[in-house]
Amino acid sequence: MNPNYLDFEQPIADLEAKIQDLRTASAGPSVNVDIEVRALENKLRLRTAQIFRNLSAWQISQLARHPRRPYTLDYISIVCDEFQELAGDRTLADDKAIVGGLARIGHRPVMLIGHQKGRDNKERLMRNFGMPKPEGYRKALRLMKLAERFGLPLLTFIDTMGAWPGIDAEERNQSEAIATNLIEMAELKIPVICTVIGEGGSGGALAIGIGDRTLMLEYSTYSVITPEGCASILWKDAAKASDAAEQLNLTARRLKEFGLIDKVIREPIGGAHRNPQQMANRLKAVLLNELEALDKVPLVTLLNQRHKRLRTYGAYENH
């Protein structure tokens, strides 16, 4: 199977292959297959819409990790009119799993920070598979404080399985780095908008995920643990990941129903990877609207609302 297609996308892959075969055959001067191609293209649109109308939580989890899904730098290249990356935590190193810098979106100057995965094996290793170490979170914090100093709104793009769990990260106090970011983000005296663009995994996501607005792309996920990790703990069997995904309620739709996020940003039919330009344009429009709305909120009110939001996390009622 083509690695760019997930298992449940196989009918889509088959139709696209047929369309490509017909187009190749029509290269000859005496062959006209326009009618057949249009019919297959219409069938492809209908089949894609049908498949994506009834996705399970596990299928959405797979989409959130799709190898062609746009990453932070992909969105930056389209959403931002200007971007100047800033590197290093000024203590140890520059963690490539976190990217960030000064940006301009339309007329709006902002600070933008996000997780960054890799497209090929070389880049995945360089980016540590999008799993930051303490120096990554300390770099992020440095940029957050810089944004606060200059009164720039902060935008974060979340896309990680979680913080790096290696011994080297623990030796450099991973938990402290995450905890410090949570504390500092809660008190930042600037508007903060957090957007889950792919995977939102545990504390590794939360460390750049505390803000005044939390947005999620339609086929992104946000959870305390991966479905595989949850299945391994609860059932001692990672093969039960699909069951775990349902129990974790990790989809954007479910989290919106629970009141844990503010907005679900609709993706193109078939997912963000099928039309990154369209997805980025939608994201840009939403971010500009949210920034405009937050401009009207006094700073004291903004902080009070942020604190109230944090205190409601985990609260529930028995009925």
Swiss-Prot record:
Protein EC: 2.1.3.15
Entry GO MF terms: acetyl-CoA carboxylase activity; ATP binding; carboxyl- or carbamoyltransferase activity
Listed GO CC annotations: acetyl-CoA carboxylase complex
Pathway: Lipid metabolism; malonyl-CoA biosynthesis; malonyl-CoA from acetyl-CoA: step 1/1
Short name of any one Pfam family annotated for the protein: ACCA
PANTHER family attached to this UniProt entry: ACETYL-COENZYME A CARBOXYLASE CARBOXYL TRANSFERASE SUBUNIT ALPHA, ACETYL-COENZYME A CARBOXYLASE CARBOXYL TRANSFERASE SUBUNIT ALPHA, CHLOROPLASTIC
Stated name of the protein: Acetyl-coenzyme A carboxylase carboxyl transferase subunit alpha
Organism per entry: Xylella fastidiosa (strain Temecula1 / ATCC 700964)
